[in-house]
Amino acid sequence: MAAACFCARTCAVLAVALLGSSATVQAEPTNLLAGRQPERAKGVVHPERLTDGLLSNEGDEWLTDVTSRFTSVSSFVEYDLGGDKTLRCLLVQADNNDVYAMSASSDGKSWRSLWRVGAEPSPGMRARTTQLEGSARYLRLAATGGDALYSVAEIAAYSECPRAPWPADLPHAHGIPVSEAAGIKVLIFGLLAGAFVLVHRRQWPALQYILALPVLGAGWMMVAEYVGLYPFFDQEPPLRALAAGLAALVVIKEAFLAKRWAPHRAVSLATLVFCAVTAFGTYYHFGMPQFFDQAKGRRTLVHTWDMRHYYPVAKYFRELRFDGLYLASLAAYIDNTPGFRPADLAHVRLRDLRDAEMRTGTEVAGQLAGIRARFSPARWQEFRRDMKYFSDTMGGQDYLGSMQDHGGNATPVWILPAYLIFKNWPASELSISLAGLIDPVLVLLLFFVIWRTYGMRIMLYVVVIWGATDFYNFGSNLMGSTLRQDWLVALGLGTCAMKRGRHFLGGLLMAYGGLIRAFPAMATFFFLAPIGWYAFDYWHARRRLPSLGQVRQAEGSALRALVGAAVCVVSLVALTSAMFGFSASWLAWKQKIEIHATGPSTNNVGLRNVLAFNPNLSAKALSQRPQSGPWGDWATAQKMTFAARRPLFYGILLLAVALGLLACRGRTLEEVALIGLLLIPFCFYPSNYYCHFVFLLPLAVARPLLDRDRTFAVVLVVLAAMCLGQYFSLAEGWTDLRYTYQSFILLAGFAIILAYLAWESLTLAPWARPLPAAAPAASAAAR
């Protein structure tokens, strides 16, 4: 590949030279910027590429060895043409969704606008040209808008416009994407580091650590590459795969190779620390905000897409309820936008949250007065001001486009604390950014509690899976959102509480996690499994069921957890019903979720997704058919395919539940609860980011002698393999296919874990074990 790229670039350079000579003969117009170096530049990487006469192939990736990167909205480059020159044609080849300003000056101090270089609809690098009548000595190109990921391949200016087929006749080359170069360095470092982890031995002399020098050198080159790329948003996947792979090698070395190749604990610990820090950093993009503030022309910490849904739903739930978000958003946009005409409604598409069907603005226009009437005049003005922040920040097109999502789907229990947080805060970058810090603080608290409960090494493995999985990504992750990881933290803290013997508190916390997002309640339901196994063993031994007192003595921990869960459910349902009304909150939420949970969605994962998949009816395949609307036809095909395979769905579901219940035998209560989470993708149809709970699964098999525990190693290796499999799934650009592949990965991994734990349970608690005659014995789940 390198040789091919070298040949291509050599040919391109020769073409530049040949075209230059032919231009002399034919008196073609001269590019006034050809070969010039910038007079001034700010925040521009490789400015020499801007005037080297070489363009990227149309549609190529935005960041390659042919392009120059503008690192921020304040980046610019200025050129001195050597004197006043007539300007009639300009060319800029840049990333399609970038917006630039070309300015002119006679003295290099006073600038006037010459050309607004707008965005292009087609993806990748795209050339823009314009004809004009002007003159200048100095030219400036500055980034002004777009997604803040700016790159330019070429700038050209002409006193006379070149003849057709310009600019197609200019030299082009396919650049090597920077992500490939970074990925190669990650691969080299990973291979060297992995080899060292496997080969080194604790008993060998210190001289063996000379082998670490190539590892350190490769690591330095990798870090230098990423520092040069910063800020970056699409180069994290290789780092996530690296963290998962190295952590898996550490646990393999300790669990399976310790007798002959006993590792040095300091090396293992240092490797895990590196993996955990890397994985944690990739989730938070190493501190770089994800979204662009169109009003301020820079990046913002606010997750604008997520918070434009959950901020208003929380603050104005009494008015919006679960069906009014998009109608009110549209009405506020109309009121806030001078010149918006009724005819413009025909171009607006939004999801009707009553039935999840898509409709045009014209079709719902008659409902806008009704949604305004839900508000008092003062509250409506407040809502308008808050939504104006989001429409200004997102831009009108993205703001209106976001109304094709599914609204806010959180339960009334989630809405309660979010309402208390936002009710007195006007929507602003400061207020929502501060609220967005709640989640990382909660996550760090969870990691600290896991450290105190299970030890540092377990905590490091948990952090690695937390950051290395791709389940939390759907275009972006939830960095910058508020209370979107609270349910994960509640499940983790509940696990730690039960590990410490605080079963009432553990049950309460796990039930709280279930009340926030519903399907995590599987952990709470599995509190019944130890009681069921105790009753089965008692009946098998004595042919009668145990008394309530005997169950209380044997399974007191499970009963205390159930009481804690019941207290949580009853109190919070009562409180939210008192605040918001039971019918307007819980019944309305139930109706909305019943619609949302069964309708096809491209980023949903699980057994239902796999069984609804037909490669001949994917959106990609349907898009190649004439007269086909791929996404509408795709949804119909999903429903029909799943309906035909529904019996298979129930058969696999019953098998998974049986394995899950069998895996619970002989295990402690917190382990049983986490095993219950393994059934979520079999029973439900969750969005991919809700499967982020996989990072908690190492706690289901955490044992005191971790470095010799093969069960922990098997589970960790399976989870790491899932992370690696997700890395390869990212090559698929069609979202329905990508998340179908990730569904296969998820189900295969969980099936292996369930089968292994079920097989192991037969040794932890032999089938139908006899009970002592004197008194009922506590099962392992109570110990």
Located regions from the model:
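Short, intrinsically disordered terminal tails adjacent to the first/last structured region
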Residues: 2-12, 18, 27-28, 207-215, ...
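Disordered, acidic Ser/Thr/Pro-rich linker "stalks" and the adjacent N-terminal cap
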Residues: 27-84, 93-95, 116-122, 154-180, ...
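Extracellular carbohydrate recognition and processing domains
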Residues: 112-132
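Short beta-strand-plus-loop segments that form exposed binding edges in beta-rich domains
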Residues: 141-148
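Primarily membrane-embedded glycan-assembly and transfer machineries that use lipid-linked glycans
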Residues: 173-503, 531-688, 695, 767-770
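Hydrophobic transmembrane alpha-helices of multi-pass, membrane-embedded glycosylation machinery
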Residues: 510-515, 523-537, 678, 693-701
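Aromatic-enriched
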Residues: 701-777, 783
